[in-house]
């Protein structure tokens, strides 16, 4: 049995972020890839939807300028022949403030001929924003 496309993509993505080695990653991303990271775009401009390999590689370059990945744990994963879904926990450092950040995310990826054709990443943004701001978010009290 051959290695699932998710494993190759995951390794190449982390090398692209931490070591700025995008060559391996470029070969694993389809020219017409459909990419979206759901979260507060005003705070994190690299969130949002992108289309095409060049746009995705630019987003990854922007992410690499802002964070370093220290650790990631797959909490659960489901693999199909050309798809993958996973819940993950990441330990990162925000490079501008040298600040540790922990976050959870869910990702849903589709592959064709071993290349990423679509990915959706949903981030626990409430927790992420609190960590980025360095304080809890004050919510209005709900009166019943």
Which ranges hold each PLM region?
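Hydrophobic pocket/interface hotspot
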Residues: 13, 25, 33, 52, ...
């Amino acid at each position: 049995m051959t290695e699932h496309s998710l494993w190759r993509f995951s390794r190449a993505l982390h090398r692209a972020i931490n070591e700025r080695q995008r060559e391996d990653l470029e070969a694993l991303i389809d020219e017409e890839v459909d990419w979206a990271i759901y979260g507060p775009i005003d705070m994190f401009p690299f969130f949002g939807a992108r289309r095409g390999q060049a746009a995705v590689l630019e987003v990854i370059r922007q992410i690499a300028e802002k964070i370093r990945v220290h650790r990631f744990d797959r909490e659960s994963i489901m693999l199909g022949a050309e798809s993958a879904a996973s819940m993950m926990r990441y330990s990162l450092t925000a490079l501008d403030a040298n600040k540790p950040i922990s976050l959870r995310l869910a990702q849903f990826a589709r592959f064709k001929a071993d290349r990423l054709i679509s990915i959706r990443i949903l981030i626990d943004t409430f927790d992420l924003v609190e960590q980025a701001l360095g304080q809890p978010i004050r919510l209005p009290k709900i009166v019943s």
